[in-house]
Amino acid sequence: LNRPEVHTLSCGAAKPRDFDCHLEALDHYDNIAPTIKPIEQRLRAEMDSVLGADWCARWPEGLPHYVDVPDEVNISEILRLWTYSKSLDLVDWGQMRYNLLGQADHWFPGEHVAKLDVEKVADCLAASPFAERIPGILAEAHEILHAADQKRLSESDD
């Protein structure tokens, strides 16, 4: 909630007790900016160190909306998941999110890479400064993130 355009917090709570730590965090609400700034700086520095500052600053540039990609593969979301999974070791989180693709309708739209025809996608990546790298990154993302299809927490039995 450090950005003014963010007005909704999705915390993935499946049970009422899952809200406890979020409610406790409200005690620190007035200290958000000074608390978050050094944390964000360390995270961004680690991402830059692992993936390079150019990638971290520019990877979203020129990416098409998923409805403009053959077979509606959500390239921008897959690259976001790969970026955080690879640079911050958030693989478990990335797997959970990646495997929602194709399962969560409008809440998490688009398909994952299993449906991607690399030959068809080259034209829609042309505006990206990383157009040549992206097919390989998408393949790697699928390799490290694909597991069993997931359901949203609200639909799970746990």
PLM segments and residue spans:
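Structured C-terminal cap/extension of enzyme domains
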Residues: 1-158
